[in-house]
Amino acid sequence: MPAFPSAIRGMIVGCGLLLAGCASGSDLWVEIGGARYAVEIADDDAERARGLMFRDDMPANHGMLFIHEREQPLAYWMKNTKIPLDILYFDDERLLVSQQRDVPPCTLGNGCPSYPSESPARYVLELNAGEAARLGLEDGAELHPAPAIPVP
């Protein structure tokens, strides 16, 4: 009889560990302008290429953080992106160097325009359109990533 309760105890511990692993997504956030956003990370070519394509919406206080290997001139476009976005470019020091606000969705495929950074950038944060204005973001604002996000 004592083996049964210990087996149940083992199952409960195992389920708890499994659920703890699922909660790790809540550790992925950034702060800017006094606001915190849960983010998805795009840190390889495939993830960066797909970005927020084909999404019908994005919850409030959510975004996507694109991490590039090095600081460089960057340009993003809205190909197959159904929601308007603010595109915020940050340098190696995670300082805001360029903003493209209220960028409209584009369904023109390869005919969609690109939205370049005004200075070299390494990190790009895409938020729902209007967030940069709501926060009153100005160039030089600092991006603060969660400790769980792999940035140097």
Predicted features along the sequence, with ranges:
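N-terminal secretory signal peptides that target proteins for export/translocation
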Residues: 1-5
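General structural signal for secondary-structure boundaries
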Residues: 7-8, 44
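Bacterial N-terminal signal peptides
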Residues: 9-20
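Compact, glycine-rich, soluble single-domain proteins
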Residues: 22-152
